[in-house]
Curated annotation (Swiss-Prot):
Residues at which [4Fe-4S] cluster binds: 133, 239, 368
Gene (name only): DPH1
Protein name: 2-(3-amino-3-carboxypropyl)histidine synthase subunit 1
EC number(s) recorded for this UniProt protein: 2.5.1.108
Function description: Catalyzes the first step of diphthamide biosynthesis, a post-translational modification of histidine which occurs in elongation factor 2. DPH1 and DPH2 transfer a 3-amino-3-carboxypropyl (ACP) group from S-adenosyl-L-methionine (SAM) to a histidine residue, the reaction is assisted by a reduction system comprising DPH3 and a NADH-dependent reductase, predominantly CBR1.
Organism: Eremothecium gossypii (strain ATCC 10895 / CBS 109.51 / FGSC 9923 / NRRL Y-1056) (Yeast)
Domain of life: Eukaryota
Amino acid sequence: MSTADEVTKKPRRRFVGVSRGENKVSTKQVSGDEAKELVRSAKSNTGARRAINQIPDEILNDENLQEAIKLLPSNYNFEIHKTVWNIRKHNAKRVALQMPEGLLIYSLVISDILEQFCNCETVVMGDVSYGACCIDDFTARALGCDFIVHYAHSCLVPVDVTSIKILYVFVTIGIDEDHLMKTLQKNFAKGTSLAVFGTIQFNPAIHSIREKLLYSESHMLYITPPQIKPLSKGEVLGCTSQRLPKEQFAAMVYVGDGRFHLESAMIHNPDIPAFRYDPYSRKFTRETYDQHQLVEVRSSAIEKARNSQCFGLILGALGRQGNLATVANLEKKLRAAGKKVVRIILSEIFPQKLAMFDHIDAFVQVACPRLSIDWGYAFNKPLLTPYETNVMLGQDRMFNEKYYPMDYYEVNGYGRGKQPTHDNVI
């Protein structure tokens, strides 16, 4: 198994975990019937038919459009035909294109294609887009756009709540599935049950190898793409991942580059060994996270905030990161506890910015929980998440080294404006 280089420990990093190489992989085997039931349970249990947008042949077979698409990388699926059809169908006149910084290099090519084949004007939105929570339909509408195409993230914000028409393009990426399967077969014993997940770009590959490995005659593995609704099966976000039954899985495997999203699953499931397969470098590494340090740092922040009298309640204004219902719920609870609350709106939250609020004793941010988890140490005053604020107020379960919830955008999560409880979590 290829391993990542040993990471030199430094005081206070962005993340509290470290990546290490391991020579051995512990495996957990289950009976054939049990494992197949796990795989079957990962499949959709609904028989409802999905509405299919039939793209007209005149678009699918347009030779000029086909030639234009060749200007884009062939292993990146920008779904140009589907985009052209939707823009035409809605008769959109000004279309906003929003994508993460890594894809902006292709934005002008896509813009030219859409303007030529849709008879519309396009606006490339250059502000940072960290995830689907950053979809900025408000700014797009202010710019006079009547349609927005959001690239590389899943449908976290439903299409029926945005202020203008929206199309999500996942930008799925083709990878070497054979190499991924052989890597898993080499590192895990036959019959091992694995939870495999990744970002939305690699979701098709995960589902593809699941079936192939299940029916492999030489080295069968049981692959389960876990799901925490409303995310897709096998999808994970940096703030939202499923709590997995540790007795059912020998390990969890993340398919993707970087650690940010994987860290969510490691925080949520500290007792399950974690591995990462990078489809670009084709390296397979053992990953770890310092749960003790996480608990130590976040517990300290809560204790410091507990005696604070004046709280700055921050609504994240980067796209749709913030949730007004959650802000209102937290304000009500803080005031009921005798705290003074100052409302603040920020698109991005930086230590230097919050340091200017001298009269505020502690902050609560309704934007991204990873801001507090990853960067909380860098702020001169406590910066709590909605969950940690409820813990401080005695209205949610205290975390420990075995459990810290990462369910922010779950259907009943704080990111949805709900007030979840974690009392019954095992």
